[in-house]
Amino acid sequence: ILFCPASGRQYHSLRRLFAPAADELTYLCENGAVLFGPDNPGQLLGKTVMERERALALAHQIMDIPECEVLISGVNTSYLCPKKRDVVDHIRYFVGNNLAILPTVEDMPEDIVKVSAYCPQGAVEVQPVLGPKWENTFHHAIAGEAWLDFNLANKGTGLEQLCQALDVKPEEVMAFGDNFNDLPMLEAAGCPYIMDNAAP
């Protein structure tokens, strides 16, 4: 049996969460956009890259919302153009990401795999603003109370890529989910389960 955390979180954040067994796990990160195998560091099994110009346009729209911050994800590092200092500490120490600060989003030094709106007042408030503008370009999902994530992958496509990389049939996969970003994964897995504490 192979255990694989599937999350909107970054690879390094997941490794910290699962520290006692981190080297034994496979990882589906950034809502399916980045896949890592076991060991330390794990082998990169796949990544799904966003078109840069459109991703940066989305990042600018998020920055234009006064109560939101934009977090741009590469494979191993998240990038932030912070409006407030406390968001840096939150992402670095509470979320546990490897984090770099950018002067502007155009300074993003690597491929973009995910763009996230961090909205402490609630992602459901900004989803109706951003979602319809980008739904024909990127997948988007509410990923926890404060996060609205955009990328070209989702946990379902990530699971399919992971199954191919590991030579596992989707019907042999058991998946557990509790939020909207889990729906594509639950649809792709042979044995899906919704947690009791799932979002309504």
Language model feature labels by segment:
Residues 1-87:
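Active-site phosphate-binding/coordination module
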Residues 3, 44-47, 148, 175, ...:
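Generic anion/oxyanion-binding catalytic loop in active/binding sites
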Residues 32, 196-200:
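Short, polar loop motifs at secondary-structure junctions
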Residues 20-23, 31, 133-136, 188-189:
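Short, structured coil segments at secondary-structure junctions
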Residues 61, 67-176, 180-188, 197:
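Conserved acidic, metal-coordinating active-site core of Asp-based
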Residues 27, 192-194:
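Short, well-ordered beta-strand core segments
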